[in-house]
Amino acid sequence: MSGFLDFKAVVEQEKLRPVRFTDTGRGRLGKLLKAAREIRGWSIIETEMVTKEYEAALFRTAGEPVPKDVGISNATVSRYERGKLESLDWRSLSLLCFVLKPIDPVTGQALEPTNALYIACEHPPYNDTKLYE
């Protein structure tokens, strides 16, 4: 039991560092999201509508009332695509990944939201410029 308590003390002492997204990383992520949207043949407004429908369906499936602010606005979709968001919102980034299913440049599979964050902050192995040529 003392090992558990020691571990807990160590965890409480750790400090979380902020993640720093780079302009290059946000731009790369934006290009991946835009390419995925264009492959689907959706406009930015259609993408907004699909994210609203997707998130509303999640609430209905869980048996919860659907809030009025579900989905991602077309302005936010546009800012993501241009790499112009100063901070990335986990909810909206996850929705975009689940709805658009951009291709992960490392795995070749659908991009997971966590890996999208790695792209935005140029974390290895997502910092290799050859992946984005």
What are these regions (language model features)?
Residues 53-75:
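Short, positively charged loop/turn segments that connect secondary-structure elements
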Residues 36, 50, 80, 119-120:
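Residues in the recognition helix of alpha-helical DNA-binding motifs
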Residues 43, 54, 73-76, 89, ...:
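Short coil turns linking two alpha-helices in DNA-binding domains
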Residues 8-15, 107-133:
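Short, charged recognition helix plus adjacent turn
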